[in-house]
């Protein structure tokens, strides 16, 4: 799974940048599935995206499966997203050896805070 995860998602993101003619230098954030911090760090380095553009929620919430990207958006950069426009690349991938990437332009979206229940 590790080999797949550091090969296919970066290739998918590079394909996205080529298809839509933009550079990762121009994005505000790269939000990756939160499966493993080491793996996400490797993907970021492989794509040459600065660490400060890659928010993490893994340490607080663990691997939350398909919810990891929206959770990371809310807890990692939610306040910033409500105050400013942002160009964001998201990439999800999983142990079923599946992956997907998207380029989204956000315009002052409303990010409600995460509600934690006991």
Regions found by a protein language model. Give the residues of each.
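Oxyanion-binding "anion nests"
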Residues: 1-29
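Claisen-condensing/thiolase-fold acyl-transfer catalytic domains that form or cleave C-C bonds
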Residues: 6, 10, 28-118
């Amino acid at each position: 799974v590790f080999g797949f995860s550091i090969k296919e998602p970066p290739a998918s993101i590079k394909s996205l940048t080529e298809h839509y003619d933009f550079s990762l230098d121009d994005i505000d954030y790269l939000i990756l599935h939160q499966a493993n911090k080491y793996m996400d760090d490797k993907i970021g380095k492989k794509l040459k995206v600065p660490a400060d553009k890659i928010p993490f929620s893994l340490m607080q919430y663990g691997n939350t499966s398909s919810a990891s990207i929206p959770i990371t958006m809310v807890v990692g950069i939610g306040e910033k997203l409500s105050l400013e426009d942002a160009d964001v690349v998201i990439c999800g991938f999983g142990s079923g050896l599946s992956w997907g990437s998207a380029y989204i332009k956000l315009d002052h979206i409303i990010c409600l805070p995460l509600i934690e229940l006991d």
